[in-house]
Amino acid sequence: MAGRKGGERKKAVTRSVKAGLQFPVGRIGRYLKKGRYAQAVGSGAPVYLAAVLEYLAAEVLELAGNAAKDNKKTRIIPRHLLLAVRNDQELGRLLAGVTIAHGGVIPNINSVLLPKKAAGAAEKESTKSPKKKAATKSPKKKTAATKE
């Protein structure tokens, strides 16, 4: 007969594997249903949401890894996450209301508070007349004492 009673079972293929994702499609689908966001949840919604979340996570981790490398570190810490998110215009706007614990602050010094000698020195150099060449010394004349 056509039944498979004693045969080997096929290994289950998850929806995450079918979609080529690392994030769990089944778990996200379960959360969507349990959260009562809508009366029904389509079969493609958890796949799409998992793909979006995976993309955002990859983007943040890549930028945080670059920030860690810039600081000569091999481990990503919350400070690197904050620097990555706040220095990226789109992610900064998306996560504008988010506080990252132990992230610190973005370094920023108001331009009014910066010393003016760098700008002042450049202006002084341009207003000064061109420097004259230093006079070269003529060779010493031999005197009676040096002739001996």
UniProtKB/Swiss-Prot annotation:
Q: Where is this motif: SPKK motif 1?
A: 129-132
Q: Where is the composition biased (Basic residues)?
A: 129-148
GO BP annotation list: heterochromatin formation
Q: Which intervals of the chain are annotated as region Disordered?
A: 120-148
Tissue expression: Abundant in meristematic tissues.
MF-aspect GO terms: DNA binding; protein heterodimerization activity; structural constituent of chromatin
For this UniProt record, the keywords arranged alphabetically read as follows: Chromosome, DNA-binding, Nucleosome core, Nucleus
Gene Ontology cellular component annotations, sorted alphabetically: nucleosome; nucleus
Q: Where is the secretion signal located?
A: none
Residue span of motif SPKK motif 2: 138-141
User: Localized where?
Assistant: Nucleus; Chromosome
Return the SMART domains for the record. Answer: H2A (SM00414)
- What function is annotated for this protein? Core component of nucleosome. Nucleosomes wrap and compact DNA into chromatin, limiting DNA accessibility to the cellular machineries which require DNA as a template. Histones thereby play a central role in transcription regulation, DNA repair, DNA replication and chromosomal stability. DNA accessibility is regulated via a complex set of post-translational modifications of histones, also called histone code, and nucleosome remodeling.
Record remark on domains: Contains 2 SPKK motifs which may interact with the minor groove of A/T-rich DNA sites. Phosphorylation of this motif may regulate DNA binding. This motif is reiterated in both termini of histone H1 and in the N-terminus of sea urchin histones H2B, but its presence in the C-terminus seems to be unique to plant H2A.
Family membership, please give it.
Belongs to the histone H2A family.
Assembly with partners or alone: The nucleosome is a histone octamer containing two molecules each of H2A, H2B, H3 and H4 assembled in one H3-H4 heterotetramer and two H2A-H2B heterodimers. The octamer wraps approximately 147 bp of DNA.
UniProt-recorded name of the protein: Protein H2A.6
Q: Which organism is it from?
A: Triticum aestivum
The lineage is: Eukaryota, Viridiplantae, Streptophyta, Embryophyta, Tracheophyta
Gene name, Swiss-Prot/TrEMBL: H2A-3
